A protein has these predicted regions:
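Surface-exposed loop/edge segments in extracytoplasmic proteins
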Residues: 87-93
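Short beta-strand micro-motifs in enzyme catalytic cores
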Residues: 1, 9, 44-46, 57, ...
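Aromatic/acidic polysaccharide-binding cleft in carbohydrate-active enzymes
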Residues: 1-25, 34-41
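Short, hydrophobic/aromatic-rich segments at coil-to-beta transitions
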Residues: 29-34, 56-58
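C-terminal beta-strand-rich structural cap/linker in extracellular carbohydrate-active enzymes
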Residues: 93-128
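Hydrophobic, well-ordered secondary-structure elements that form the walls
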Residues: 20, 59, 110
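Hydrophobic alpha-helix feature that most strongly marks membrane-spanning transmembrane helices
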Residues: 25-28, 64
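Carbohydrate-binding surface patches
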Residues: 38-78, 85
């Protein structure tokens, strides 16, 4: 059937319902501030400020196709946490000053960045 519930005796939710609930949970306090400047033309992303957490930056990032690791140089960031569309969290490894983000066609929401590490990695919203 159509919709976000399966038509069975339990009315179980479909994956889209879980993804939507997680999207609302992860993005409801975020204000977009710019477009991520990816090195690869098949990688897309946006930078947000979390208004609930004093403007802490959040990166939303994904690939058009395939899977690939995105390396982001970080000097001030100490740890990063990624959340997939189903709400599963992963610790993003930082090795020798590079954050290693595992990308796929599914959106990864990454928090924990120091804004000084992102300031040259996005195009401000008013410019696009």
């Amino acid at each position: 059937g159509f919709g976000i519930l399966r038509y069975n005796t339990m009315l179980t939710v479909k994956p889209a319902a879980v993804a939507f609930a997680n999207m609302v949970n992860n993005y409801r306090y975020l204000k977009p501030i710019g477009k991520y400047l990816a090195k690869d033309r098949k990688t897309y992303g946006f930078i947000y400020e979390n208004e609930k957490e004093s403007g802490a930056p959040v990166l939303s990032i994904w690939r058009e196709a395939d899977e690939k690791e995105e390396l982001i140089p970080v000097k001030y960031t100490k740890s990063l946490t990624g959340v997939d569309i189903f709400g599963r969290t992963i610790e993003i490894p930082i090795i020798d000053g590079m954050a290693h983000l595992p990308l796929s066609m599914s959106v990864l929401t990454v928090s924990g960045f120091d804004m000084d590490d992102l300031k040259n990695l996005y195009e401000p919203k008013e410019q696009y």
